[in-house]
Amino acid sequence: MHEFFLYYIKKKYVIMFKHLISFIKTVYQNYFEIASCLGAVFIILLAIFMDNYLGLEACPMCIMTRYAFGLIAFISFMGVLTNKLYRFNKLLIVLSSLSGIAVTGKQIYLQNLSPEEIANLSMGCGMPLSTQIEYFGLIGGISNAYQGGPTCAAENWRFIFNFAEWGFIFFITFLLLTGIKLIKGR
């Protein structure tokens, strides 16, 4: 009796897993742009929630990460509206993902420095990103913020990974899935 019960439960989980895989394939093949847009918007909303309700302050690199997610959301939404620019939209998502990987990768690098190395960093993350862009111009402000600083090296939140590591994982996922779509065509 006990073995039959275990067999029955195992069979149910296998069927449920097959349905889940089938659902993921359907979403990937038919609703990729909508899923990408919603996923990126969800990540941005989560970051805003963490700022406003958990009292965490976003450093300039975190803001640049949000902009990369925003680009992915916007380009994915435009992909839903315009089917004629399919390859161009996918290429823009790949470029946005690469920029997000660069920013989050640099932030992860900064977070893994020793305290002595962090103390020797420039103050690239000392001012808010908007202030840096106002003083140094768009390219200068982004370049200065990308250099990083002690503020960007701080880990304020962790759920298995910190926010930069989660962002890195999501950007890699966006890059791989979009790259496969770009190579295969539709």
Language model region names:
Residues 6-60, 69-72, 83-186:
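Secretory/periplasmic and organellar redox-cofactor proteins
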Residues 63:
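Cys/His-coordinated zinc-binding microdomains
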Residues 66:
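Cys/His-rich microdomains that often coordinate metals
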Residues 79-80:
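Interfacial segments of multi-pass membrane proteins
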